[in-house]
Regions:
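Conserved beta-propeller blade repeats
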Residues: 9-28, 55-73, 111-112, 158-162, ...
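Well-ordered alpha-helical segments embedded in enzymatic catalytic cores
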Residues: 5, 20, 201-205
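Structured, non-catalytic alpha/beta "coupling" segments that mediate domain-domain communication
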Residues: 67-95
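Hydrophobic beta-strand positions in blades of beta-propellers and related beta-sheet-rich domains
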Residues: 1, 25, 37-39, 70, ...
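Cap/lid segment of the alpha/beta-hydrolase catalytic domain
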Residues: 53, 86-92, 96-215
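Beta-strand C-termini and the immediately following turn/loop, strongest in propeller blades
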Residues: 26-33, 40, 71-78
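Multi-bladed beta-propeller domains
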Residues: 1-19, 42-60, 89-107, 212
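A detector of repeated loop/turn-to-beta-strand junctions in beta-rich toroidal repeat architectures
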Residues: 34-36, 80, 139
Length: 215
């Protein structure tokens, strides 16, 4: 018999993995360089979007056919990977375990901004910093970007970045063309004859930060 399409392709998100737990399908997508998770019935009907703890990167959602719960890990720019328990029926996530750290992750914030590159292309960038930061044009910024080899740059934890943010710095992570945050066209737009786009994106990121008084 012919194959039946259960989860149609979504032009606005990249499907990264699919997991079967209990009587449900969990689809992990990447949208604007961070994770989204959707819960479906086995027939492909949407149950809900999983309410994640914030902007970050997710993994997990595995389990047995008769499971009533599942677990996933969630990491951000400002907190190390933590494990959450997810109730399949209610959609509620509860913290199950996380490493002990000598700082309060709630003291920091991450926002996502979009800016126009030289050719007008909208490029996303994550900005992480200590709460209470003043946009007065005087903050030091660590601007990091990678655009190549079809590799995405998604939220991840670094204690070094936390140390910088504790001293008043901003950690800026820009999703340059050349990665796969938006699929193959985004990848091709930053390779070979289009490589200049990668550098233009990075320069435009710095200009955005200056123009908006982050630094």
């Amino acid at each position: 018999s012919p194959a039946e399409k259960i989860l149609p392709e979504d032009p606005n998100m990249l499907l990264q993995s699919v997991h079967f737990v209990g009587d449900y399908i969990f689809a992990i997508y990447m949208k604007d360089a961070s994770s989204r998770v959707y819960q479906y019935t086995l027939d492909g009907d949407l149950v809900r979007e999983v309410a994640l703890p914030g902007i970050g990167t997710v993994a997990g959602f595995d389990g047995k056919d008769d499971a009533t719960e599942t677990f996933y890990t969630f990491s951000t720019f400002t907190a190390p990977p933590a494990v959450y328990r997810y109730d399949l029926a209610t959609g509620e996530s509860t913290l199950f375990a996380r490493p002990e750290v000598k700082f309060n992750p709630d003291d920091f914030v991450t926002e996502q901004v979009f800016f126009a590159s030289k050719d007008g292309t909208q490029v996303p960038m994550f900005l992480s910093y200590h709460k209470g930061l003043k946009k007065n044009g005087k903050n030091p910024v660590y601007l990091y970007g990678y655009g190549g080899f079809n590799a995405p740059l998604t939220p991840g934890f670094s204690p070094t970045n936390i140390a910088m943010m504790e001293q008043g710095a901003i950690y800026a992570s820009v999703n340059l063309r050349g990665g796969n945050e938006y699929g193959e066209e985004w990848h091709k737009a930053g390779m070979l004859a289009n490589k200049q786009n990668v550098f233009d994106d990075f320069i435009a990121a710095g200009e955005y930060l200056v123009r908006n008084k982050y630094t």
